[in-house]
Amino acid sequence: MVLIKEREMEIPVIDFAELDGEKRSKTMSLLDHACDKWGFFMVDNHGIDKELMEKVKKMINSHYEEHLKEKFYQSEMVKALSEGKTSDADWESSFFISHKPTSNICQIPNISEELSKTMDEYVCQLHKFAERLSKLMCENLGLDQEDIMNAFSGPKGPAFGTKVAKYPECPRPELMRGLREHTDAGGIILLLQDDQVPGLEFFKDGKWVPIPPSKNNTIFVNTGDQLEILSNGRYKSVVHRVMTVKHGSRLSIATFYNPAGDAIISPAPKLLYPSGYRFQDYLKLYSTTKFGDKGPRLETMKKMGNADSA
């Protein structure tokens, strides 16, 4: 494992190539430490075609420039900021692609056939990586290899989708966040991000840790609220945000390996805690409390699960 130093905080980098040799035990221990103590880390040698990753980034950037940039800068939010006014909004241009259990990419405006095919190819490789990572997490938690996958599954398996976002240049970065402070609602988040423009920050040990741009197409991973519940609090979701910058437009392609909407979520039986709830019920609560403290939200769901099992 390599450690990237950023403002005296070392960000774990897990080398998946070391999982197949004599260093496997050490690498598994380092992965467990990253999940347990950090909630975010980078993965190198993940097995995803790096030329394909470059192609995805290039095509998404071109799509933004051609179809979304002008619309963003003509929005009421941008006009208000030019007058020094702020609102509870995020300085981002984004859309969401659902991949599994059903795809919606053909319904998204101005997505070319080439971009659609390229995303499908990338997501296919990324899905295999997500499943491999979930199995490794299960192993470290003392669970059966497919426990996370099974817990996340509805009738058609776990949900898999991608938030594509650009965080454009902002004339008043002191007044706006690219994305306000929050934890992620779902399970395992796999981020392909900009290799030049920074902005992502995670909160750890009382301070904000800036995440550097991803060189050499490493995958940045963080764990969401449902993995915290499933692991009975061992693998915690972490508060993060995106800062705006005056110069440079940051790209973020975040893919979510999530429970199906009707999946029943509870801590794994081997890790105790008896309650369970539907992920879609959690999302309803999350939609109104996303930018608040996650603690009361998780406690509410625990109580709901206890009531349902009583």
Curated annotation (Swiss-Prot):
Annotated keywords:
Coiled coil, Ethylene biosynthesis, Iron, Metal-binding, Oxidoreductase, Plant defense, Vitamin C
Where does the record place a coiled coil? 113-133
Identify the species of origin. Answer: Arabidopsis thaliana (Mouse-ear cress)
Q: Is RNA-binding among the key words of this record?
A: no
Residue ranges occupied by any Fe2OG dioxygenase domain in the UniProt entry: 158-259
| One Pfam family of this chain | 2OG-FeII_Oxy
Origin superkingdom: Eukaryota
- Which family does the record assign? Belongs to the iron/ascorbate-dependent oxidoreductase family.
Identify which cofactors the protein needs according to its UniProt entry: Fe(2+)
Cofactor, free-text remark = Binds 1 Fe(2+) ion per subunit.
Q: Which GO terms describe its biological process?
A: cellular response to fatty acid; cellular response to nitric oxide; cellular response to potassium ion starvation; defense response; ethylene biosynthetic process
Q: Which EC number(s) does the record attach to this protein?
A: 1.14.17.4
Reactions catalysed: 1-aminocyclopropane-1-carboxylate + L-ascorbate + O2 = ethene + L-dehydroascorbate + hydrogen cyanide + CO2 + 2 H2O
The residues listed in the UniProt record as binding Fe cation, with positions renumbered to this chain, are 182, 184, 240
Q: What is this protein called?
A: 1-aminocyclopropane-1-carboxylate oxidase 1
The metabolic or biological pathway listed in the UniProt record of this protein is: Alkene biosynthesis; ethylene biosynthesis via S-adenosyl-L-methionine; ethylene from S-adenosyl-L-methionine: step 2/2
- Name the job this protein performs: Enzyme involved in the ethylene biosynthesis. May promote stem elongation by maximizing the extensibility cells, possibly by activating ethylene biosynthesis, in response to very-long-chain fatty acids (VLCFAs C20:0 to C30:0).
Up-regulation conditions: Upon potassium K(+) and iron deprivation. Induced in leaf blades in low light intensities. Seems repressed by ethylene. Accumulates in response to very-long-chain fatty acids (VLCFAs C20:0 to C30:0). Induced in roots by nitric oxide (NO).
Question: Which GO molecular function annotations are given, in alphabetical order?
Answer: 1-aminocyclopropane-1-carboxylate oxidase activity; L-ascorbic acid binding; metal ion binding
Task: Give me the residues that bind 2-oxoglutarate, please.
Answer: 250
